[in-house]
């Protein structure tokens, strides 16, 4: 019964969040969860290890590319700000150079849903991105190098990703 009540509360809180970019896009409360276990649970891309290693680990196992699709995993390169890289699941492609992602630990101890990421690379190849920063309510000023996108096998809709997010949090917390 307690589990059902908790799930109802999570779904109710998620429903309260509008389409805007604000704290309403936080999923649940504080969670001690890294990006990789969460992305693995949400996307089905069964890779292990630090996020920056996912690109090489995916070779020969998953399709890799430079065009986003919902359900794929955006892999950030290691950088001064991201010493282990970062991974985020694409929840929607809104424009050719703008996507929404659902991710863990971009904001420490938080899962954020439908956060904007824009391609600022000179070659329009998603090799350099800027990410929405929820605490400020706007796009972050940092520029982050990225490898590209890993596809799990089939695309997912934004609604499917939103519905799967609370369960992915629970799965990732057990890993």
Q: How would you label these PLM feature ranges?
A:
Residues 1-9:
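Sec-dependent signal peptide recognition
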Residues 6-7, 44-45, 139:
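Alpha-helical interaction segments
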Residues 12-15:
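C-terminal motif of bacterial Sec signal peptides marking the signal peptidase cleavage site
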Residues 17-20:
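Bacterial signal peptide processing site
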Residues 23-89, 94:
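Secreted/periplasmic proteins that engage bacterial cell-wall peptidoglycan
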Residues 97-175:
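Aromatic- and glycine-rich peptidoglycan recognition patches
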């Amino acid at each position: 019964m307690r589990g059902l009540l908790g799930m109802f509360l999570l779904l109710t809180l998620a429903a309260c969040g509008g389409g805007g970019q604000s704290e309403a896009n936080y999923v649940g409360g504080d969670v001690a969860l890294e990006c990789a276990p969460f992305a693995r649970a949400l996307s089905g891309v069964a890779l292990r290890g630090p996020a920056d290693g996912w690109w090489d680990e995916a070779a020969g196992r998953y399709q890799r590319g430079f065009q986003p699709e919902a359900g794929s995993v955006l892999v950030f390169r290691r950088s001064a700000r991201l010493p282990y890289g970062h991974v985020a699941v694409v929840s929607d492609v809104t424009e050719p150079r703008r996507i929404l992602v659902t991710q863990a630990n971009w904001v420490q101890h938080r899962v954020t849903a439908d956060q904007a990421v824009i391609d600022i690379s000179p070659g329009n190849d998603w090799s350099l991105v800027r990410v929405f920063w929820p605490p400020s309510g706007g796009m972050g000023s940092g520029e982050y190098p990225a490898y590209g996108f890993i596809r799990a096998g089939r695309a997912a809709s934004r609604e499917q990703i939103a519905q799967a997010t609370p369960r992915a949090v629970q799965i990732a917390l057990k890993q």
